[in-house]
Amino acid sequence: MGLLVTLIGDMVGSRDLPDRAGVQRRLAAVLDEVTGLLDPAQRLETTVGDEFQGAFDDVGTATLAALMVRLALLPEVDVRCGLGEGEVVVHDPTSTPLLQDGPGWWAARAALEELARPRRSAARTWFEGPDPGAAARVNAFLLARDALVDRLGERGLRLLAASLRGSTQADIAAAEGISRSAVSQQFSRGVGAVRDAQALLSPPRGDGEDDT
């Protein structure tokens, strides 16, 4: 399939979840939803165990997908996503999940394995690519972005998820049943920073970016 950004993710601490079957069904539904929103080169789908994968045409959309999946599952379940840029070879396009490998796929696998190292225990997204300098810049963004997400409460997580889907602050206030002022306060505490930083890497969706 040529040069892609492959995403390979897994659930954090999945063996300790009380309802693993229910969580797997929820993950599958979230992956279908994000696939519909972002139109990836390869749809997001579960693979084996607690893992899932997909592929995108650019790193910005891949980082957005990782964040959208994470936000849809938090706070009950957390995920880690390894992203790898490079050529992907699909050996059997009829299989589900796709039977594939190649430098891009292995780079994503290496990125996920990096997240399993003790020094990355707090990180949730990592990128490996052919240009070390570019990869370092992407990872600097991802480390800061995911740390900000970790500081958000449940409402902040919902507001950020809605904003990334294109909802304006007025839309969000109506959906949450709270005032515009309360929404604005949440945006000033990190929601807006994450949304705006993400928009620099991936195209904004809807009108949410215009309503500050």
Predicted regions mapped to residue ranges:
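Regulatory and interdomain segments flanking nucleotide-handling catalytic cores
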Residues: 1-212
